[in-house]
From Swiss-Prot:
Protein's UniProt name: Aspartate--tRNA(Asp/Asn) ligase
CDD domains linked to this entry: AspRS_core, EcAspRS_like_N
Subcellular location: Cytoplasm
SUPFAM superfamilies: Class II aaRS and biotin synthetases, GAD domain-like, Nucleic acid-binding proteins
Binding of L-aspartate, residues: 174, 220, 450, 490
E.C. numbers: 6.1.1.23
Residues at which ATP binds: 220-222, 229, 483, 535-538
Protein encoded by which gene: aspS
Organism: Pseudomonas syringae pv. tomato (strain ATCC BAA-871 / DC3000)
Record key words, sorted: Aminoacyl-tRNA synthetase, ATP-binding, Cytoplasm, Ligase, Nucleotide-binding, Protein biosynthesis
Keyword Chaperone: no
UniProt-listed Pfam families: GAD, tRNA-synt_2, tRNA_anti-codon
Length: 591
């Protein structure tokens, strides 16, 4: 081996030992005739000193520049008093260099690594192989590896088998567009890249492999956001003969162990909350419990007022009127309120009413608001008592359809919590349970809230009689307002699966065409089964404090789903297209 140690492994216990390092020159300094090289590798940094008494190595050190690849032989020694660098793991020692071999030279990088400045993301992605040399980026990938190692070990120890499922499969309706792959040997037919291993892992349960896991690549052709990529990694888990409480307990323990091992963070038992409670209190099915603000329903106090903005939704069975108290924010400037009003409009809210509580003892006179005149004093007092308002608070109101109010005030709650730094803790894990089985579309049809293979908490007959009120056996793990993982008990009886398909408007011939293999499998002794899938990229993003999953993926795509480093996607030559039986239509020329 060319090296004896990584730079990040050096410490006082190695003092006096001769070691060999290989890495990149991070920084070169010439101080009073002595040359210092900071050598960097994936594990960290080490300072190497070259003395003019060793002419050959000193001359070689004088010639090297940043990002040269070098091999250094030297002896570990303690740094002189006053020269200890507390910012380096190896900052108490240095290496006295005996030999220096340049393994490769480097041109000047497109951006500096030793004095990292605000470089545009596209430049970083174009030269990702250089960007990943930065210590903070290397640390993220190291932590990602530790996370997957911890998870694999836990699942292996608990009897799970690591089984790979196909990447080339067929298109199934799972909510997003598929990436399609044309078949050369079957003209006119296409494979699809899997959006998840969902159906294959269920078939593994039918086959008797009762504890499965896989760290799986998944693909979705959808619009990108901060936490989305066209290809992403999933920690996929499926079990047989366990109920939802068993699966929740098993995976919660895995996450608790993971955080203890990797971040030395200890979690207690995760609280559970129903979907309905989460939406009413927090306006979200993935509430951030670090934030103490809550939504409070007040429609019963506003259903008789003459102000139609409130009374209309208050008397609408599908409407909602809710309040959000922000403690100590009565001094909020009108310009800030206007900004928040504009913000909630993104979610469909038509306005943002408010009451500033200056002095409650004075009654309506002590309240500052354009809406106070529309609300009887008795109702005002009930509302302020219900939300816990005291002098110095501001109370915001939303009134519209339930979905609009919940999403708008829920998003405002998060924004204000961040703006005013209201978080009460660093980590807040939880479970959300009792999700609706379906969501109703504007035309009265139904869509699966999770996916069509989720089991309901009722019989097929009850489900078809009352689909709008049916609850599913689904559960989501949420951390700091981010969905870490979602899962459910699956349908294991053919009759129930067909009932769900019918409610989703999937006719019998389409059921056979797209899911015939699954329906066939359910006839042959499918066991009760369920599972869960974690988004690995999101998990690593949260654990490293990164702002985007692009920061924790070695070679991510841009927000336009392109790889600027390899220039993918690219044009394919005509011969390859002919072999695939594809002919491209000419794009109409712009006028």
């Amino acid at each position: 081996m060319m090296r004896s140690h990584y730079c990040g492994q050096l410490n006082e216990s190695l003092e006096g030992q001769e070691i060999t390092l290989c890495g990149w020159v991070h920084r070169r300094r010439d101080h009073g005739g002595v040359i210092f090289l900071d050598i960097r590798d994936r594990e960290g940094m080490a300072q190497v000193v070259f003395d003019p008494d060793r002419a050959d190595s000193f001359a070689a050190a004088d010639r090297v520049r940043s990002e040269y690849v070098v091999k250094v032989v030297g002896k570990v020694r303690a740094r002189p008093a006053g020269a200890v660098n507390a910012n380096m793991a190896s900052g108490a020692i240095e290496v006295l260099g005996y030999e220096l071999e340049v393994l490769n030279e480097s041109e000047t990088p497109p951006f500096p690594l030793n004095e990292y400045s605000d470089v545009g993301e596209e430049t970083r992605l174009r030269y990702r192989f250089i960007d990943l040399r930065r210590p903070e980026m290397a640390e993220k990938l190291r932590l990602r590896s530790r996370i997957t190692t911890s998870i694999r070990r836990y699942l292996d120890e608990n009897g799970f088998l690591d089984v790979e499922t196909p990447i080339l499969t067929r298109a199934t309706p799972e909510g997003a567009r598929d990436y399609l792959v044309p078949s050369r040997t079957h003209p006119g037919s296409f494979f699809a890249l899997p959006q998840s291993p969902q159906l294959f892992k269920q078939l593994l349960m039918v086959a008797g492999f009762d504890r499965y896991y896989q760290i799986a690549k998944c693909f979705r052709d959808e619009d990108l956001r901060a936490d989305r990529q066209p290809e992403f990694t999933q920690i996929d888990i499926e079990t047989s003969f366990l109920n939802e409480e068993d699966i929740i307990g098993l995976t919660e323990k895995m996450v608790r162990q993971l955080f203890k091992e990797v971040l030395n963070v200890e979690f207690g038992d995760f609280p559970h909350m129903t979907f309905e409670e989460a939406m009413r209190r927090y306006g979200s099915d993935k509430p951030d419990l670090r934030n103490p603000l809550e939504l409070v329903d007040v429609a019963d106090q506003l259903n008789a007022v003459e102000f139609k903005v409130f009374s209309g939704p208050a008397n609408d069975p599908k409407g909602r009127v809710a309040a959000l108290r922000v403690p100590g924010a009565a001094s909020m400037a009108r310009s800030q309120i206007d900004d928040y009003t504009k913000f909630v409009s993104i979610y469909g809210a038509k306005g943002l009413a408010y009451i500033k509580v200056n002095e409650r003892a004075k009654g309506p006179e002590g309240l500052q608001s354009p809406i106070v005149k529309f609300i009887p004093e008795e109702n005002l007092n009930v509302i302020l008592d219900r939300v816990g308002a005291v002098d110095g608070d501001i109370v915001f109101f939303g009134a519209d359809k339930f979905k609009v109010v919940s999403e708008a005030l829920g998003a405002l709650r998060i924004k204000i919590g961040n703006d005013l730094k209201l978080h009460t803790c660093e980590w807040a894990p939880m479970w959300v349970v009792d999700f609706p089985m379906f969501e109703e579309n504007d035309d009265g049809s139904f869509s699966a809230l999770h996916h069509p293979f989720t089991a309901p908490k009722c019989t097929p007959e009850e489900l078809e009689a009352n689909p709008a009120t049916a609850l599913s056996r689904a559960y989501d793990m949420v951390l700091n307002g981010t969905e870490l993982g979602g899962g459910s008990i699956r349908i294991h009886r053919k009759e129930m699966q067909q009932a769900v398909f019918r409610l989703l408007g999937i006719a019998e011939d389409e059921q056979q065409e797209k899911f015939g293999f699954l329906l066939d499998a359910l006839k042959y002794g499918a066991p009760p089964h369920g599972g869960l899938a974690f988004g690995l990229d999101r998990l690593v993003m949260l654990m490293t404090g990164a702002q985007s999953i692009r920061e924790v993926i070695a070679f991510p795509k841009t927000q336009s789903a392109a790889d600027v480093m390899t220039q993918a996607p690219g044009v394919v030559d005509a011969k390859a297209l002919r072999e695939l039986h594809i002919r491209l239509r000419e794009q109409p020329k712009a006028e």
